[in-house]
Amino acid sequence: MELATTGKVNEVLFMNRGEGESSYAQNSSFTQQVASMATLALENAVETLFSKDFHLQALNATDLGCAAGPNTFAVISTIKRMMEKKCRELNCQTLELQVYLNDLFGNDFNTLFKGLSSEVIGNKCEEVPCYVMGVPGSFHGRLFPRNSLHLVHSSYSVHWLTQAPKGLTNREGLALNKGKIYISKTSPPIVREAYLSQFHEDFTMFLNARSQEVVPNGCMVLILRGRQSSDPSDMQSCFTWELLAIAIAELVSQGLIDEDKLDTFNIPCYFPSLEEVKDIVERDGSFTIDHMEGFELDSLQMQENDKWVRGENFTKVVRAFTEPIISNQFGHEIMDKLYDKFTHIVVSDLEAKLPKTTSIILVLSKIDG
């Protein structure tokens, strides 16, 4: 199945389900580390909402692309804690919190809600009662009524595309990104242009939908994978996909995967630069940028000395968020071989040190009027 349409991507884009060794629930420590870097931004966003004359009785918040790991629980806890702090300061008596957890229909909502505990949401007798609902669907379209949201949070989700970029075959139907699954140094310029164009289209749709749902002066805190370089083929931004493509190509050479399946597969994901994100937000015109920054984190658990353990841990993280979409293209039966090959490639690259991962924090306010 080629990922050429939004419907097909929506069917296979989700994190590994359950709570097993390869599940996202057990391998989300890196995204948890990323999200923790944005905790202050989220706290400030809640503080800002209370400084505006909303006359709040209930704060409506959503976590878009919440997946099924513990990270979304930390988001709920942070919002609730800040609301309780403001309630004590302002002597509020009736404030409530409504949180909507959103992801695509294939998301493991069962594991997600099984993990919700009284420690996360508290009880209804507390000073800020918390109510949680699931909202399945694509955040590239409308999910909520007009002017219904005060706060939008999303971590490591907005960089996923609605489909593989259009125009990656020539007039004869031959692949233009042969042997690769993302932008690389050998990709022709049209591949880079197609990826940026698709991200521009999708992020604009995201902003347009939120502009209708978020109340005037409401806030959005977005964390997405990005890059520091202006070059989208820079190894810092594409090394995961580059190493996966090498692993897939080795299985092609062994006759375990058809070469055509590799040549026709392009991952529906784009890691933008800060300048590209800023340009799209300003062109859309619905939100002002209150804060934007990029930061780097080690891609591996550097405290682990054994390079094989580090390589295996990195593979588990990558497998947790790539296996559903990769197995859809290449087959479930070769996944163990593929990720074992990936581990060997990662370990061999450790000698040259894998690049750090760049993330972007973006805080937006809905323009009033």
Curated annotation (Swiss-Prot):
Keyword entries, A-Z: Magnesium, Metal-binding, Methyltransferase, Transferase
Residues annotated as binding caffeine: 31, 156, 159-160, 225, 321
Pathway(s) served: Alkaloid biosynthesis
SUPFAM superfamilies: S-adenosyl-L-methionine-dependent methyltransferases (SSF53335)
EC number: 2.1.1.160
Catalytic activity: theobromine + S-adenosyl-L-methionine = caffeine + S-adenosyl-L-homocysteine + H(+); 7-methylxanthine + S-adenosyl-L-methionine = theobromine + S-adenosyl-L-homocysteine + H(+)
Residues involved in Mg(2+) binding: 177, 263, 265-266
Site (Involved in substrate discrimination): 153, 225, 269, 317, 332
Highest taxon of the lineage: Eukaryota
Residues binding S-adenosyl-L-homocysteine, per UniProt: 24, 66, 71, 103-104, 138-139
One example GO MF annotation: caffeine synthase activity
Record flagged with keyword Transferase: yes
UniProt cross-references to Pfam families, sorted A to Z: Methyltransf_7 (PF03492)
Cofactor note: Binds 1 Mg(2+) ion per subunit.
Family, as annotated: Belongs to the methyltransferase superfamily. Type-7 methyltransferase family.
Name this protein carries in UniProt: Caffeine synthase 1
